[in-house]
Design a protein with these regions (language model features):
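Metal-dependent catalytic neighborhoods of phosphoester/phosphodiester hydrolases
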Residues: 166-177
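Short acidic capping loops at alpha-helix termini that bridge into adjacent secondary structure
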Residues: 149-151, 190
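Metallo-beta-lactamase
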Residues: 1-139, 141-143, 151-163, 175-244, 262-270, 285-373, ...
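Short amphipathic alpha-helices and their capping/turn segments at secondary-structure boundaries
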Residues: 84-92, 100, 143-146, 180-185, ...
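Conserved beta-sheet core of the metallophosphoesterase superfamily
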Residues: 177-179, 185, 250, 256-274, ...
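Catalytic metal-binding/acid-base residues of hydrolase active sites
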Residues: 106, 161, 199-200, 246, ...
């Protein structure tokens, strides 16, 4: 397959290579703890992102047994969380670069086997009105801050669960469901999908534990020159990195951004910042769970592909993220799908929510700055 060489664009990060290579999960965790301080010192010295903003896409239900794995006491079946997109910009090589992190097209994501089954169970009306709430789309958010499709250089997702990027990147053949008469024309004419090679490689041969969360057939006709494979940890630009954090999936990675308040980390390994500090949580059960087990984190465990590896990745995220200014025991970890309170989910309201980040000014390449909204 003809794809771009990420090594020509991004800098390889090597601080965690010994930890990644260690097959012993306990020793691996020790190596992660040892590597984090050196990584943080180096990463902060690379500079800061020029813009880092979040945008709400959709609030929807999700099984509590996955979101707060084994920890929450509430008898409810579902929690509610808000899925968000992040716009990240940095300056390098005399220009501004723009990354969309988690630009989920939620209408197409609803065709994922798990969510399609839930919609059949509860019906279209309840699923799309009472049980979920749609904010603005990816396109609307970009328009609101003055960005055009051609301004986007890269898109990425922490992993490919639920994703369908055909409209974003274009296809080589007509698509019966969205473009039956002609190949799909890319909405983002220049954007490349940054994806871990390990994540991409599982798509043709999904395990039964994985199948209900992916739409592998939706990637078969993606234009080859739109794929940008990475292997492990990479620095995208000053103050912006992707950190390989497997476990939830084999190719999971986390967005790492240096800002005026320090380092932020984002992924879906955990659904709340307090899942990384459960002893500080007011959600019934989480503090007791942490005290009883000694666990430092509460996993988002819908696939349980590699539980100890996901645990280690979450500890890595927790240690890399700097503490919140207003609550030093809570890390600046911003879940890409963040837990929120809901009338139908008593006993699951988080004690702490980031809700929004807005650092710096989003600009058009070669244009004037526009304050993000």
């Amino acid at each position: 397959m003809k794809v771009l060489d990420s090594n020509a664009l991004f800098q390889k990060i090597t601080f965690f290579e010994e930890a990644h290579a260690d097959p012993n999960p306990g020793r691996q965790l020790e190596r992660i703890r040892e590597a984090v301080p050196r990584f943080k010192e180096w990463f902060k010295a690379t500079g800061k992102a020029t813009a880092f903003h979040s945008y709400d896409l959709i609030t929807l239900p999700y099984p509590k047994k996955y979101a707060l794995w084994r920890a929450a006491w509430s008898p409810v079946a579902y929690i509610w969380f808000t899925n968000r997109m992040f716009i990240v910009q940095w300056e390098a090589e005399g220009r501004v670069w723009t990354l969309l992190n988690e630009p989920t097209e939620y209408e197409l994501a609803s065709n994922t086997p798990y969510f399609a089954d839930q919609i059949r169970k509860y019906g279209q009306f309840l699923s799309h009105t009472l049980l979920s709430y749609r904010y603005q789309t990816v396109e609307q958010h970009l328009e609101s801050v003055g960005l055009r499709p051609e301004d986007v250089d890269f898109i990425t997702f922490d992993h490919l669960h639920t994703q369908d990027v055909r409209r974003w990147l274009g296809t080589t053949r007509p698509q019966p469901d969205i473009s039956p008469d002609a190949p799909v024309k890319a909405y983002f004419p220049h954007a490349k999908l940054i994806v871990q090679r390990k994540e991409w490689d599982i798509l043709p041969h999904l395990h039964p534990l994985q199948k209900i969360w992916y739409q592998p057939e939706k990637f078969e006709d993606i234009l080859e020159d739109r794929l940008l494979f990475i292997d492990g940890d990479v620095l995208l630009g000053p103050g912006v990195a992707l950190m390989w954090t497997p476990g939830h999936t084999q190719g999971n990675h986390s967005l790492v951004v240096n800002t005026d308040t320090g380092i932020w980390v984002s992924s879906e390994n955990g659904v709340a910042a307090e899942c990384y500090a459960p002893r500080e949580s007011g959600i019934p059960g989480l503090r007791r769970y942490a005290e009883k087990t000694g666990f430092e984190v509460v996993l988002n465990a819908n696939t349980i592909e590699n539980t100890s590896r996901q645990y280690n990745s979450m500890v890595q995220e927790k240690l890399v993220a700097d503490p919140c200014e207003n609550h030093p025991r809570i890390p600046q970890f911003f879940p890409s799908s963040e837990l929120r309170g809901h009338l139908f989910a008593p006993g699951t309201k988080p004690s702490h929510q980031h809700k929004r980040v807005a650092f710096g000014t989003i600009v058009r390449p070669g244009g004037k700055g526009t304050l993000a909204k």
